[in-house]
Every structure is written in structure tokens, then in C-alpha cells.
Amino acid sequence: SSLLVLVSLACRPDGPTKPPKDPCADFEVEIERFWSASIKAKVLDRGGEVALARRSGVTNKMDRISEDWVRMRTSVCKDHFVRGTIDQQQYAARVQCFDDRLDRQRTLATALTADGGSDLTALESAIDELLAAPASCASPAE
């Protein structure tokens, strides 16, 4: 009889009920749209052996920026939705900051993979600037 209940639930016209989607899941997917192992490999393959060490340093920094973004974005999401330690206004401000950082990361990743070679020195400087900014997107008062 319990099997019958399971079958009847699965065969409902509206389908089986699904658990609510976790609002704090899948931030990695956003990053992987523009910074993944294959994109990193493409950056490392550009240019000659001489610049390989510099490109390797740049890609390692992009890895760190991306990992920090996912970790901090997930943490802030959980602060709001799970732990309730920040209100909607604080959450919205932090999300806007994370979106801005993500746009900067996307721009840098696009420049790193662009044909015609971008100015690696300028890109290194922009990446260092992004690394220097607080990854948490917290205001000084927090």
C-alpha cells in the first residue's frame, strides 16, 4: 500500500513535489561561464614560453578571485536566507557589490582570452586591484 501511495504521488498531473530550490546553490555555475579549466588552459597556451610564468601567475590570481567570489557570495546568501544575520537591504547591497565584482572578473577573463593579445601588464594591474578589494563586499561598518 505504501508503494501505491508513492506511485500515485509520482504520477500526479503536476508531477512529484520537489523540494524548494536552494537560493544559495550553484554560484560556481556563474563563474564557470567565463572562467573554467578550459578557459584557463586557453590563456596559458597564448604566447610563447617566455611569458608562460606571467600568464600562470595571472591565471592563478583569477582562480583565487573566482574561488573567493563563490565562497563569499555563498556565505552572504546563507547569512540572509539561512542564518538571518543580515536583512534584505544589507543583502541587496552586498549582492550588487558581488555582481559588480563578477562583471569586472568577466571583463578581465574576456580580455585574457581575446585574439590579438591584450596588454598583460595592464591586465595584471587590474587583477591585482580586484584582489586588493575586500572579497566579502562588506562595508567598513560591518
Q: Where are these predicted regions, by residue range?
A:
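Internal signal-anchor transmembrane helix that establishes type II topology
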Residues: 1-6
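C-terminal motif of bacterial Sec signal peptides marking the signal peptidase cleavage site
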Residues: 9-10
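Hydrophobic alpha-helical transmembrane segments in integral membrane proteins
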Residues: 13-16
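Aromatic-rich surface patch/π-platform used for binding flat ligands and interfaces
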Residues: 18-142
